[in-house]
């Protein structure tokens, strides 16, 4: 999950935090794989205390292309496909595989927006064979969104891969 404390920009944080809290009531022990706080533009420690104490949180390396790989505030937008946090993908796979070996979860759950989270979930599923649940909070593609035709094609292809390859998809 990209949207996880200490990021301070999205209501998606609450969704992931509540999953961590309430899934335990149904016999699940959530593990959270998220990105390094360095990737977040705005952080706040305010919600860190809402993470249940017994929930394991691992943070993988990742950068925000627009901030960390730009020159004079400009960056090559094609480097940021499918999103600005694509550099999280390799670190997410590495950290996720270590977590899977150590904790042996029953399933993989990824949530978007931030398509890279689903790419990580898909990659982990392919390597482990674990069931993968893809939580699609917002539309990935719609007519005219994203505006850039190449980005639309890339997002559309990823969207189709997610729905085709995941074990279950959740749409809200």
Ranges and model annotations:
Residues 38, 128-133, 141-161:
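Nucleotide-sugar donor phosphate/pyrophosphate-binding loop at the beta->alpha transition
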Residues 56-91:
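A short, charged, and often flexible helix/loop element on the N-terminal side
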Residues 82-94, 105-128, 134-136:
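An aromatic- and histidine-rich active-site surface loop
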Residues 164-172:
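A short beta-strand/loop micro-motif in the catalytic core of glycosyltransferases
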